[in-house]
Amino acid sequence: VMPGLIDTHLHFSGNLTDDDNDWVIESVAQKQACAVKQSYDCLTHGLTTVCEIGRNGIAIRDLVNMGVMKGPRIYATGLGFCRTAGHGDSHHLPLQVSKDSHPWGDQVDGPWELRHAVRLRLRENPDAIKIWATGGGIWRWDSGCKQLMSTEEIKAVADECKITGIPLWSHSYNSVSAAYDSVRFGAEQLIHGFELDDKTMEL
């Protein structure tokens, strides 16, 4: 017997292949069906609590809570915010296709646009707001070692989160500056966080 496990970063999003184009152009029905199975698989493999970033997580959370389906306890963000040509943007596809169907990324640029996007996301009743402060290394201009969201953009999202009291989760891969900006403006969770300096740790 062992206690239930916690996974603080996953995506219920389909992804039957490792091709980021397939992730986007697969049908909505496939995304949803795979997401339901992925949620159930988490529970049967010992994960009793998960933090989910994706298009279907909020709906699955609600269905689990209502007893309609079985799954773990889910803390869901809905789609996370990245910059255009960032980690949540499949660059081989037309931008509108990515905006309409990306499984976990919403492409938003600029502080005021991000403020509005946070307010729109709040209408979906998420448990947290997710940003990609860095890339993830999927393609040439998606470096996980560079801060891809500006200081002003990170602060704008953090300020909006503080207004309502919703937690901010920040994807910060291998960038000291992205981690520092995220934490100093109020991010409660750093996702990955492989590169941290002393001043960030002190915060």
What are these regions (language model features)?
Residues 2-66, 84-90, 152, 177, ...:
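Metal-associated gating/positioning segment near the N- to mid-region
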Residues 20-33, 92-117, 167-172:
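Active-site mouth loops of central-metabolism enzymes
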Residues 32-60, 71-80, 126-139, 166-167, ...:
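Divalent metal-dependent hydrolysis catalytic cores, especially in the metallo-beta-lactamase
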Residues 38, 60-63, 117, 154-157, ...:
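Aromatic/hydrophobic pocket-lining residues that form π-stacking "cages" and hydrophobic walls in ligand
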Residues 53-98, 104-108:
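Mid-domain alpha/beta scaffold segments of enzyme catalytic cores
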Residues 54-56, 105-119, 188-198:
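Active-site glycine- and acidic-residue-rich loops that bind
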Residues 113-127, 131-132:
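Extended, non-globular alpha-helical segments
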Residues 132-203:
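Active-site core of metal-dependent hydrolases
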